[in-house]
């Protein structure tokens, strides 16, 4: 699915260099089809890097996806130029009366921060409740999963004794589910989190269907029966070097991090790691776009008023 973005967005050249099909707005305007409108709530500090990662996964399918980037933290960014934010991001007030086919809520480095100490907690609460009536399907990733479980299901924050970092093996629980269609029976996916998602907790406190899990990482992929909500506790969008960057950053900050599991060649952080989860990440997002968004969203978004009931 070619993604449709601003002509000047830095991700255009970055992704084209990776042989990823990107369609600029000027070219897309010549095609007489309705593109899917997908809103990305980017909560990560390095916004350009995160844009590249998610746009890569959203790009590999036959229909147009019209991307809108959203920010809810008005503080000055230390990691992203103000010009970039002003040019390519909207505020919630700009889109609060619009409808979208899909919403992606990214992770955030906030797993050790109490929810009500998160500066933009009221804003994310507002966005998630707004999405009930304005978005066909929402995909939550890592910290966003923890936030959504608290806001939508009242589940308190659960924290691991030791940070989970590395590439872990997962196995399917529902191989015939639409979201896992085409998945291998076992597959690899990266994690980088302090949040804990025990399978028993999800089953006990929600009606969500757990689709895949890991012996080490717990529940990995789960979703609502109506396809309105999908949750991924890992980071299938990560680049090959993202975990390495986080590991070296934490070492430089004196945090004494553990070596990411099943990641560095020969467990040597001086060797360049390879991505072993890329095909899984592409298939997961393609399935979400197809079965959770495209197949159930109305052609005329003005007629959409979905509920979670």
Swiss-Prot record:
The record marks 192 as: Important for substrate specificity. Keywords: Acyltransferase, Amino-acid biosynthesis, Cytoplasm, Transferase. GO terms for molecular function: homoserine O-succinyltransferase activity. InterPro entries: Class_I_gatase-like, HST_MetA, MetA_family. SUPFAM superfamilies: Class I glutamine amidotransferase-like. Substrate binds at residues 163, 192, 249. The active site is at 142 (acyl-thioester intermediate), 235 (proton acceptor), 237. It is found in: Cytoplasm. It comes from the Bacteria. Its EC number is 2.3.1.-. One of its GO terms (cellular component) is cytoplasm. The keyword Acyltransferase applies. One of its GO terms (biological process) is L-methionine biosynthetic process from homoserine via O-succinyl-L-homoserine and cystathionine. Belongs to the MetA family. HAMAP family: MetA_acyltransf. This is Probable acyltransferase. It comes from Sodalis glossinidius (strain morsitans). The lineage of its organism: Bacteria, Pseudomonadati, Pseudomonadota, Gammaproteobacteria, Enterobacterales.
């Amino acid at each position: 699915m070619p993604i449709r973005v601003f002509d000047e967005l830095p991700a255009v050249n970055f992704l084209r260099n990776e042989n990823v099909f990107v369609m600029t707005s000027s070219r897309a305007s010549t095609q007489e089809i309705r593109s899917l409108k997908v809103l990305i709530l980017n909560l990560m500090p390095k916004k350009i890097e995160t844009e590249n990662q998610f746009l890569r996964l959203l790009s590999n399918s036959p229909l147009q996806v019209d991307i809108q980037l959203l920010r809810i933290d008005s503080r000055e960014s230390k990691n992203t130029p103000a010009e970039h934010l002003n040019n390519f991001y909207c505020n919630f007030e700009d889109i609060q009366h619009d409808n979208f086919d899909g919403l992606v809520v990214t992770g955030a480095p906030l797993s050790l921060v109490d929810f009500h100490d998160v500066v933009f907690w009221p804003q994310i609460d507002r966005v998630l409740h707004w999405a009930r009536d304005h978005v066909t399907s929402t995909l939550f990733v890592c910290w966003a999963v923890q936030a959504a479980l608290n806001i939508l299901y009242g589940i308190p924050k659960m924290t691991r004794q030791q940070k989970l970092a590395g590439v872990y093996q997962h196995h399917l629980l529902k191989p015939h589910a639409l979201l896992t269609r085409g998945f291998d029976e076992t597959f690899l996916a990266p994690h980088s989190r302090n949040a804990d998602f025990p399978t028993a907790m999800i089953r006990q406190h929600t009606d969500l269907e757990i689709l895949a899990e890991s012996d080490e990482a717990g529940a990995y992929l789960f979703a609502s029966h109506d396809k309105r909500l999908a949750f991924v506790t890992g980071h299938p969008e990560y680049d090959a070097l993202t975990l390495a960057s986080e590991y070296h950053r934490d070492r430089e900050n004196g945090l004494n991090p553990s070596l990411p599991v099943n990641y560095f060649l020969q467990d040597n952080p001086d060797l360049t790691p390879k991505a072993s989860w890329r095909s899984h990440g592409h298939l997961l997002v393609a399935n979400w776009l197809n079965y959770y968004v495209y197949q159930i969203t109305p052609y005329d978004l003005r007629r959409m008023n979905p509920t979670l009931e």
